[in-house]
Design a protein with these regions (language model features):
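Juxtamembrane/disordered regions of integral membrane proteins
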Residues: 1-144
Length: 144
């Protein structure tokens, strides 16, 4: 669980700053607040997802070995990836809705786009981290 959360946080920090940059740069070209919120979210995803995949792969490329046989346990790895996709997909849906809604609201209250992106990311990340960990525990994603 610690490595999983560490990977999410590392990728989230990278996405956090790219979302703020994307929102601010988009605001120079157009004032559409909803599109600005969507651009910020997409900017985050363009950095966040690749970072998570890379850090997760590095941490797990030698994991899940069967100590008796000495080979990688393919069935366990596939089940673990399936559970990971479930936990992250559900949590990401909540993240995206929360992020876009709060970003849009902050822009309506005259926040700078980069500030709106950062504040909305913090709110959405709080919900995401709690939700992904609760779901992960329920579907037994984390093993001892």
């Amino acid at each position: 669980m610690v490595l999983f959360n560490r990977n999410l946080i590392i990728s989230g920090i990278a996405g956090y700053f790219s979302g703020a940059l994307g929102a601010q740069l988009y605001s120079m070209y157009d004032n559409n607040m909803l599109v600005n919120a969507i651009v910020a979210l997409l900017s985050e995803y363009c950095v966040d997802i690749p970072f998570f995949v890379i850090t997760f792969y590095i941490d797990n490329k030698y994991g899940h070995h069967d100590p008796i046989v000495g080979k990688k346990n393919q069935a366990f790895s596939k089940q673990n990836i399936k559970n990971l996709v479930i936990a992250i997909s559900v949590s990401e849906a909540f993240y995206a809705v929360t992020k876009i809604f709060t970003h849009y609201q902050f822009l309506h209250h005259a926040m700078e786009p980069y500030q709106a992106a950062m504040a909305s990311s913090l709110i959405a990340w709080t919900i995401f981290i709690v939700l992904v960990n609760v779901i992960g525990k329920k579907i037994k994603l984390f093993h001892k």
